[in-house]
Structures are given as C-alpha cells and as structure tokens.
C-alpha cells in the first residue's frame, strides 16, 4: 500500500518497492511473482508483430511481439532518439524475424513539411518497402488505454532482458497534486511515456483480430 511502499523507498532504500502512484506497479509485481518476466525467446515458427510509438523530437519505441493462444509475448524492444526513418527501417530489416505486420500510431499518417508533404506511413511503405504497415486509429483516451493495458497485463510475458522497457513501466506514474495532496488522474510526462504508450497501443491491437 501507499504507506509501506513509501517507507520501503525512503527508509529501507528498496528498489523493489512500487513507485508511488505507479500505474503498473501491481501488475509488474504479479508478472514477476508468476514467472512471466523471464527468458522469452523468439519462436521462429511464429510471426512477429511490431508496435510503435514514434517520437519526432524525442524517443521512438518499438515492441516486438509474438502471440500464441492467450499469451502475448514481448520478445524484444528497441528505443532511440534523434534518428531518421532509414535508421528504424534498418533496425527492422536487421532482425532475424518474420513479420506479420507493423502497427504505427495514428499520427504516423500526418503529412509533414520536412518530408515534402509525405507521412511516416508513406515513407515507410514507399521508400523503405515495409510490408503490412497499418495505422492504429486513436479510439480511446489516454486513461482508457492505460486501463486496457492493465487488463492485458495478465496475458503478458516479457523478456527479462528488456530492462529499459521494464524500468519505464515501473516508473510510469500519476502526477502528484501538491495542493490537494493526492494523485491526479493523468500521467507524468517524461521518458517513461514512450514505452508506456507503445504498451497502450499493443493493448488496443490485442482487441483486434491478429
């Protein structure tokens, strides 16, 4: 609870205690205790789907996902910033995976002046020949997406080597209202958002036929 987590963090210097206000702290703890954060190897008999959060001036995050029955396996992740689309296309082609589709966020269809009036979607499909690229429409609010991701968590298996992703999910948290002495119903916007957004998009994909 709030009191014990705060005590462990401040007085016992515990890094295992849930971050105060964490959206996914309980779900991460359950995944660890149930052995779902482990060595999740690539299965060459299954296709890989990628789910993206694209940052234009900051981080881009890619999740590499395999789905079998009710298991949603995050086998790999990639993040970087300040890179062009050719870089990310190279990351995709450089992996040993067979892909089913690449899911981009809704803003990837926006046309930009810097790209001569072309969208990220158009550049990926025409310049870099990525196949089966789809756009995830923005159907839910951020908080609805976070709730959907929490529901998805019981099906998640996450490769333990994806430390940045796991750390981001653990630190993704609500804003604190110092006047009212309570957490606001919206997240802190920092480096954790890009990883959390990619998970949120994955939770929307899970509801669709895959």
Tell me the role of every PLM-derived stretch:
Residues 1-54:
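ATPase catalytic-site recognition across NTP-hydrolyzing enzymes
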Residues 24-25, 43, 58, 140, ...:
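Poly-acidic low-complexity segments
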Residues 63-190, 207-210:
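Mg2+-dependent endonuclease catalytic cores in nucleic-acid-processing enzymes, primarily RNase H-like
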Residues 21, 203-204, 208-210:
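Charged phosphate-binding loop/patch that engages nucleotide di/tri-phosphates or the phosphate backbone
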Residues 194:
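Histidine-centered active-site/metal-ligand motif
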């Amino acid at each position: 609870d709030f009191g014990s987590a705060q005590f462990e963090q401040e007085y016992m210097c515990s890094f295992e205690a849930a971050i105060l206000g964490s959206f996914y702290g309980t779900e991460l703890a359950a995944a660890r205790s149930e052995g779902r954060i482990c060595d999740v190897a690539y299965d060459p008999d299954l296709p890989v789907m990628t789910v993206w959060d694209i940052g234009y001036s900051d981080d881009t995050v890619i999740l590499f996902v395999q789905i079998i029955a009710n298991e949603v396996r995050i086998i790999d992740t990639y993040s970087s910033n300040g890179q062009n689309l050719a870089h990310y296309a190279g990351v995709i082609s450089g992996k040993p995976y067979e892909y089913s589709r690449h899911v981009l966020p809704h803003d990837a269809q926006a046309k930009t002046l810097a790209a001569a009036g072309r969208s990220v979607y158009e550049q990926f499909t025409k310049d870099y020949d990525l196949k089966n690229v789809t756009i995830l429409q923005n159907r839910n609010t951020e908080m609805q997406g976070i709730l959907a991701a929490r529901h998805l968590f019981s099906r998640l298996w996450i490769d333990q080597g994806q430390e940045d992703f796991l750390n981001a999910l653990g630190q993704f948290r609500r804003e604190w209202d110092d006047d009212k002495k309570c957490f606001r119903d919206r997240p802190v916007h920092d480096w954790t958002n890009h990883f959390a957004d990619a998970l949120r998009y994955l939770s929307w994909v899970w509801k669709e036929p895959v």
